[in-house]
Design a protein with these regions (language model features):
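N-terminal secretory signal peptides that target proteins for export/translocation
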Residues: 1-22
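Residue-level signal for nonpolar/aromatic packing positions in well-ordered secondary structure
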Residues: 35-37, 429, 771
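Intrinsically disordered and other compositionally biased segments
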Residues: 8, 13, 33-35, 44, ...
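Short, structurally constrained coil/turn elements
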Residues: 39, 166, 326, 376-379, ...
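Secretory targeting and sorting signals
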Residues: 18-46
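Predominantly soluble domains enriched in secretory-pathway, periplasmic, or organellar proteins
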Residues: 45-470
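N-terminal pro-sequences and low-complexity stem/linker regions of secreted or lumenal proteins
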Residues: 425, 440-917
């Protein structure tokens, strides 16, 4: 346990690639916005307040985090450097806090609440104080027995039961398994003990049931069928109240989308679930039918006190209050503090103080909402907000102190001597005594400031707007000079990995793996259209990253599933991973715009026989030379009907057995035949690495595909009114000297500022808001509603000079075995002024045995084939494998003293937080 010292970063001077200074244009940009406001009367969102600040920097407003927010919590803070807290509980005597954690060096930690020190770490590492067999942890728990002598930790296949020593540490881990139901593991949710401690009632999330377990023997005594994905649970007398995140079972005639083998009632357009329920179980009468109470969407936490059961409706942004005497909802409390947006606050925990103050954590707003509450029938009165750390997820009281567990703590700032990575995750506890109502209101203003919530952030044009067209209009629906937006999604790279070798930017070349001789097109695009060296991806991994791009949010369901990712990983085909406000494509359609999707957010793929990497590589060359259609038509699809309707067949999704230049040819044929839509989305994924070719070759393939695509667009009749955004889904697969979330982005348009270095803070959220503003798409939630569009990246004066793709300098067939029948790829000469890229796959004799071990390891990581899963591999291992390949097995990974075997990598004991099971 330690408190992280915040990095203090001085503002640097930004240098134009051609000598123009734009780094100090914060005043200019602000002035431009003010002029726009003076003309239109439209207020603007407030993420421009970041200026050129960097993530991790401490400012007067708080610490900058990667989600367009500041954090500066009320009360005291204790940072936990052992990963993200998934759930936590306080011991009955109030002296200890037990927290399940993930993405770090433990699965469970026990903290002394008096000293703030970690007393014990439990996990799968040899360095942990107590070893257990599995590191996977569930969404809810752990749970103490009423006498404090036992603690039960929820895991994928049941529980691990511990005895509690006199000093609060744990001992004697014992498995309490719950058998799988076919392919469905238990995936236990919350648990609660009977008053006498003899029975544990468990919400078996993966099997849609609740079970009663004998606490002494682990035997299941009784089982009740409930709704879909039971999660929270509370015991009031002899009655259980269980939240079903997926709602009621589907009925005949329902439109449904699957979640972990269960069909869930769903909206076919938004892909979101449409019901939420609480199951009511009489534990004293085994024959009694299970009752059902309808609540809001995605009911998660359940808390009972003073004749009421409180249920957080995470997707509906409300709290249902159930009167236990009446057995029904008697009031619904709104948790939508900012009038500009009704979605995206994500209430996820609740408690009631003895003096009648209801406290609700708002995970995505980094705040606790405070209400005055007296009884179930008397409407609660909103008081205000208290700031927390990043993504609060649990709240309780210990004496007069409020204790808040924050899943993401202070963001990815775990100490790392080699550089920063998104998996350097932290969590934190914040503790405070509740201030007076006046004090809460004072803190409310700080929460608004930290979130950028300002009045008038979302304004729409009048029905008959006569505004002059500009690239990024100030009001939604006003005309834009840009009619066609292309969103190209790539995989996993940090800024330093790709652009660290560009001296004009804020880079560190020692961390650059894919410099100018691997990514000549991205470097040329940066030279022509501008370099952005202060842009951030928000997610830790692909499960989160694609959500941020498509929903401008990573829903709480995915956030809280990171301890095991067994229900789903990428939630494209999981109804519970979708917000009720829909996606960027549904917003475009609602605005009357056309959409085409090429692989992005899709989840289904069928390939014909013979569709190997080698054959598809040769096929792409034939298509380019002759214009012939592919010889290997690939079928793709989505579980979301609205995405299926706009998907272009034949364009593969994530599949490292498919070259990206093949994908580019599939797109090019459609482009030539039918032209672009208003919104065009793509998934070019081979810079993920791990496929048949050497890592450098895969990134070169990705680079060439992007370069050719931009070449084609910029030489077409559509170029004059187009904008292309090239972005990574996340930046987890490498290191960055500023922050692990810093990533490359490219803004390509006649209206983009050309040949500049822009060091203003931007993020995936501000990029999404820019696209929304261009196409007139209403923002999806409070995050993109608060975001300032990337006004500073655009200019009113068009420069229609096209881009000409640069030949690849790294062989695309490097490392492929056998080589394609059409011959090996011969690259262009490398730039001798840039760092050399691999030209052969050579392994020093001393490392051949290690390289063979890595090859075997890679074959088990689901990187290719019909069951390929993005980021299935453990990230600490995958990042080293890629590094070793790009350095010909001659150089240790940054911060390491040697080249490791897969099982010896520090962190290799971790279950992959990206594994889908």
């Amino acid at each position: 346990m330690q408190v992280i010292r915040q990095r203090r970063i001085s503002e640097k001077q930004q240098v134009n690639l051609f000598g123009r200074h734009v780094g100090r244009r914060a005043l200019l940009v602000t002035t431009g916005i003010a002029v726009a406001l003076g003309v239109t009367g439209t207020a603007v969102a407030s993420t421009y307040q970041f200026g050129t600040q960097q993530v991790g920097q401490t400012t007067a407003n708080g610490q900058v985090i990667s989600s367009d927010q500041y954090i500066k919590p009320y009360g005291s803070r204790t940072v936990i450097n052992d990963g993200k807290i998934m759930s936590s509980t306080v011991s009955p005597d109030g002296t200890r806090l037990a927290a399940s954690v993930t993405d770090g060096d433990a699965s469970l930690v026990v903290m002394d609440l008096t000293t703030g020190q970690i007393k014990q770490k439990i996990g799968t590492s040899t360095a942990d104080d107590l070893r257990i067999s599995s590191g996977a942890v569930g969404q809810e728990g752990p749970t103490y027995s009423p006498d404090g002598k036992q603690l039960w930790l929820g895991q994928a296949d049941g529980y691990t039961k511990f005895t509690v020593n006199a000093d609060g540490t744990l001992a004697s881990p014992t498995a309490v398994p719950i058998a799988a139901d076919g392919a469905k593991q238990a995936l236990v949710g919350a648990a609660v003990f009977s008053a006498d401690g003899s029975t544990v009632y468990s919400a078996v999330n993966g099997q849609n049931k609740v079970v009663a377990i004998d606490a002494a023997t682990g035997t299941i005594k009784q089982s009740w069928a409930v709704g879909t994905a039971p999660r929270g649970i509370a015991l009031v007398g002899g009655t259980l109240y269980v939240s079903n995140e997926g709602g009621r079972p589907a009925k005949a005639g329902d439109t449904t989308i699957n979640s972990y083998g269960t069909d869930v009632p769903a909206n076919p357009k938004t892909g979101a679930s449409t019901t939420g329920t609480v199951s009511v179980i009489d534990t004293a009468d085994p024959s009694a039918a299970v009752g059902t109470i309808a609540v809001g969407l995605h009911p998660t936490a359940v808390y009972a006190k003073k004749g009421a059961v409180f249920v957080t409706n995470t997707a509906d942004n409300s709290v249902s209050v159930i009167d236990t005497r009446k057995g029904k909802v008697v009031q619904t409390i709104a948790t939508q503090p900012w009038p500009e947006a009704s979605v995206g606050y994500e209430p996820n925990a609740v408690t009631l103080t003895d003096d009648g103050r209801l406290l609700v954590t708002l995970g995505r707003a980094n705040a606790v909402a405070v209400y005055r509450y007296s009884s179930p029938q008397q409407p609660a009165r909103y008081v205000g907000l208290l700031p927390t750390d990043y993504f609060p997820s649990e709240i309780t009281t210990v004496g007069k102190k409020v204790v808040v567990s924050n899943t993401r703590g202070v963001d990815a700032l775990r100490p790392d001597a080699a550089g920063h990575n998104t998996h350097d995750t932290t969590s934190s506890l914040t503790r405070f005594t509740l201030p007076s109502d006046l004090g809460v209101r004072v803190q409310t203003a700080k929460v608004f400031k930290q979130n950028g919530w300002t009045p008038g952030s979302v304004k729409t044009a009048a029905s008959k707007s006569h505004a002059k067209a500009v690239p990024v209009p100030a009001r939604l629906g006003d005309p834009s000079t840009i009619k066609h937006v292309f969103l190209l999604v790539k995989e996993n790279r940090t800024y330093d990995q790709v652009f660290g070798d560009i001296p004009q930017g804020d880079g560190n070349s020692s961390l650059t793996q894919f410099g100018a001789n691997v990514t000549p097109n991205q470097h040329a695009l940066a030279q022509q259209f501008g370099l952005y060296d202060n842009f951030y991806d928000i997610g830790t991994n692909s499960a989160e990253g694609h959500n941020w791009l498509m929903q401008s949010d990573n829903p709480e369901y995915t956030e809280s599933s990171a301890g095991e990712y067994t229900r789903s990983y990428d939630t494209e085909n999981d109804v519970l991973g979708h917000q009720k406000s829909g996606f960027i494509w549904t917003g475009a359609q609602a605005a009357g715009k056309s959409v085409k999707d090429f692989g992005e957010f899709q989840s289904l793929e069928t390939k014909p026989a013979g569709a190997t990497w080698q054959n598809l590589y040769c096929d792409s060359k034939n298509m380019a030379a002759t214009g012939a259609e592919t010889a290997y038509p690939i079928k793709t699809g989505s579980a979301i009907p609205s995405l299926n309707d706009v998907s272009v067949q034949g364009f593969p999704l994530f599949d490292l057995d498919v070259p990206d230049i093949y994908k580019e040819q599939i797109w090019q044929q459609d482009f030539e035949k039918s032209g672009p839509a208003n919104l065009n989305m793509f998934w070019f994924s081979n810079d993920h690495t791990g496929g048949p070719a050497n890592a450098a070759a895969e990134v070169a393939d990705n680079d060439l595909a992007v370069g050719r695509m931009v070449d084609k667009i910029t030489h077409s009749k559509y170029w004059k009114d187009s904008a292309i955004f090239v972005v990574e889904d996340d930046s987890q697969a490498g290191l960055d000297h500023v922050d692990g979330h810093r990533a490359p982005v490219q803004v390509i348009s006649p209206y983009a500022n050309h040949s500049t270095v822009d060091d203003h803070y931007y993020s995936q959220i501000t990029m999404v808001r820019t696209i929304e503003q261009i196409l007139g798409i209403h923002p999806m939630n409070q995050l993109d509603s608060a975001a300032t569009p990337m006004y500073g990246a655009f200019t009113k004066k068009a420069d229609t000079t096209p881009f000409t793709a640069v030949p690849n300098r790294t062989s695309l067939t490097l490392g492929v075995s056998p080589q394609p029948s059409c011959g090996s790829d011969t690259p262009a000469p490398q730039d001798t002024k840039a760092a050399a890229a691999p030209t052969t796959v050579s392994v020093p004799a001393a490392e051949k045995a290690l390289a063979a071990q890595w090859k075997t390891w890679a074959s088990h990581q689901r990187l290719t084939g019909p069951n390929a899963v993005p980021d299935y591999a453990n990230p600490t291992q995958m990042n080293r494998y890629t590094w070793y390949q790009t350095h010909n097995w001659t150089k240790p990974y940054p911060g390491d003293s040697k080249i490791y075997a897969p099982d010896d990598v520090p962190g290799a004991y971790l279950p992959s937080p990206e594994s889908d099971g």
